[in-house]
C-alpha cells in the first residue's frame, strides 16, 4: 500500500534530502507505516545551500519520499485552484491512501482529489482554519476565513476517517457524518524528561515562547 501525506508545511531541500524545521518528524511519518509500506509527503519546499542539522529533522529515507507541490496559500492559487486540483488528481492516482492534514490548502486540494478518485481519505483535523485566518491580522485573511471554514467543514463532513487532536473542541466545529470512523488523540511527540530537569529551581526570569511556524 502506498500512502500520500498532504500538508502546507515548508520543507527544506538540501543535497537531495528533505528536512523539516521542527513541525514534522520522521517519527510521525513512521506512525503511518501500519497503513502501508511506503509514504510520500507532498508539500511545499525551498532549496537551500546550507543547513543546521541540529535544528532540522530529516524526513526522507528508504521508506519516506518527497513530492514538491506549488504554493497553494496565496491569492494566485485561488484563481488557479482548478489547475492545482488537476495536478493533485494526477499525483493522487498513483497512491492507495490519502492522508490530508487540515487546515492546509494542499491538504484540502488533495482531499478533494482523493474523493474524485474514490480513494480512502483520512483527514487529520489539527486546528481551526477560522481562528487561524481571522486572527492572523490581515484583511485578506479575514475575508478568506468564511470560505476556508465552510470548505474545511464540508471536507470533514464527507470524510470516512477523521483524526482529531482535541477531545471535543474541533469535533464540535468540524463534525463528521454518521458512521464515520473517528479518533481523538494528540499528535504531539514528547521527548523523555530527566528527573534533574524536573527538579530545577525556578528563577525570577520570565520566558515567553511561541509554538508554531512563522514562515507559512
Features from the language model and the residues they span:
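A short, histidine- and acid-enriched strand-loop-helix "catalytic/donor-clamping" loop
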Residues: 12-15, 71-76, 124-139
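Short, well-ordered alpha-helical microsegments
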Residues: 49, 106-110, 170-171
Amino acid at each position: 500500500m502506498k500512502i500520500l501525506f498532504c500538508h502546507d508545511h515548508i520543507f527544506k531541500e538540501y543535497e537531495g534530502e528533505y528536512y523539516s524545521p521542527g513541525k514534522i518528524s520522521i517519527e510521525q511519518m513512521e506512525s503511518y507505516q501500519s497503513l502501508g509500506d511506503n509514504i510520500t509527503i507532498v508539500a511545499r519546499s525551498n532549496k537551500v545551500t546550507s543547513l543546521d542539522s541540529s535544528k532540522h529533522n530529516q524526513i526522507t529515507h528508504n521508506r519516506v519520499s518527497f513530492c514538491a507541490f506549488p504554493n497553494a496559500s496565496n491569492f494566485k492559487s485561488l484563481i488557479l485552484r482548478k489547475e492545482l486540483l488537476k495536478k493533485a488528481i494526477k499525483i493522487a492516482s498513483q497512491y492507495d491512501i490519502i492522508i490530508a492534514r487540515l487546515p492546509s490548502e494542499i491538504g484540502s486540494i488533495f482531499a478533494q482529489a482523493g474523493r474524485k478518485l474514490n480513494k480512502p481519505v483520512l483527514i487529520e483535523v489539527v486546528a481551526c482554519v477560522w481562528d487561524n485566518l481571522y486572527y492572523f491580522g490581515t484583511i485578506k485573511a479575514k475575508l478568506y476565513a468564511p470560505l476556508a471554514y465552510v470548505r474545511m467543514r464540508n471536507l470533514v463532513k464527507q470524510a470516512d476517517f477523521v483524526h482529531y487532536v482535541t477531545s471535543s473542541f474541533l469535533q464540535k466545529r468540524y463534525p463528521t457524518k454518521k458512521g464515520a470512523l473517528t479518533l481523538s488523540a494528540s499528535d504531539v511527540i514528547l521527548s523523555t524528561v530527566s528527573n534533574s530537569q524536573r527538579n530545577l529551581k525556578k528563577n525570577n526570569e520570565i520566558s515567553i515562547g511561541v509554538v508554531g511556524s512563522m514562515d507559512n
